[in-house]
Amino acid sequence: MIQRPALVTPSWLEAHLDDPAVAIAQLRFEPDEDDYTAGHVPGARWWDWKAMLWHPTDRQFADPALIAQRLGSWGIAPDTTLVLYSGRNHFAMYGYWVLHEMLGHPDVRVLDGGRRRWELDGRPLSTVEPAITPVAYRPPRGARDDSSRASRDDVLANLGRTGRVLIDARSPEEYRGERVKPLPGFDHGAERRGHIPGARHLHGRDLFDPADATVKPPAELERLFRAVGAAPDQAREVIAYCRLSHRASSIWFTMTRVLGWHHVRVYDGSWTEWGSIVGVPVERPGAPAEHPEA
């Protein structure tokens, strides 16, 4: 199999803006609408991450046939190079994880630094939505590959297991149990505050250069992961989680695609699931372990 770089630079993308084999998508959630209409990478489609990747009613990823139908409706074929970016890097890396790892789309890339680096470089923006010609998309796999996911039952059954490290990628305030939601206006939280027992904290934001949002150099990433005992010679397995799994997918992406470490999975139920399950333990500094009650 040809190994393709998962991260692309703004200069690479600008050189491929007119390449018919390359499609660009800006992943967003509702507050980002004005960002897209005010100006976006030329040719970029505009995707609501949940509408593109999730089941229409269930708290579950859409099956490959449905995602394939959605991709085809946006003019994306199985041999298309798909470049994802966002105003928040986590969303693009989440999209990569779902589309490449679980769906099996062969060539997915993430724009390093996302929209921020693109604008800082003074690169062109467009207010024109691209013309789309739908195509037929045959799923590369017959079923979704869930091998990079961890379930709540798996996490619960292996709490404290030697060789397994849990990484909480939320903000320090969320980890300490001072709040559940990172920003006001979100409609999905949890019944309890705190973190999964034994989880070590590594804020997903710390994976990126604060100046331009690019991924930090490999040596710096390795230092961060070693500080929480997550390097391959320190842990047999790493499970990353956050609130909804966007920040956790950045842990997965940087470990697997930048450092080449493949002993990591994502608990995608994350805190919105764990923090509301009846009967599971919760740690919060200064408080005894909590067991949510009905």
Residue ranges and their predicted role:
Residues M1-D35, R115-G194, V282-A294:
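Flexible, polar/low-complexity N-terminal or interdomain linker segments that lie immediately upstream
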Residues R28, K50, R170, R205, ...:
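Anionic group-transfer/hydrolysis microenvironments
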Residues A51-T81, R200-E237:
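Helix-loop module immediately N-terminal to the HCX5R catalytic loop
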Residues Y36-P42, Y96:
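Glycine-rich loop at the start of a catalytic domain that most often binds anionic cofactors/ligands
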Residues H55, F61-T162, E178-R179, G194, ...:
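Thiolate-centered catalytic microenvironments shared by cysteine-dependent enzyme domains
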Residues P20-I24, P106-D107, G163-R164, E237-V238, ...:
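Short active-site oxyanion
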Residues I2, A219, H262-A294:
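Extended hydrophobic/aromatic segments used for targeting, binding, or gating
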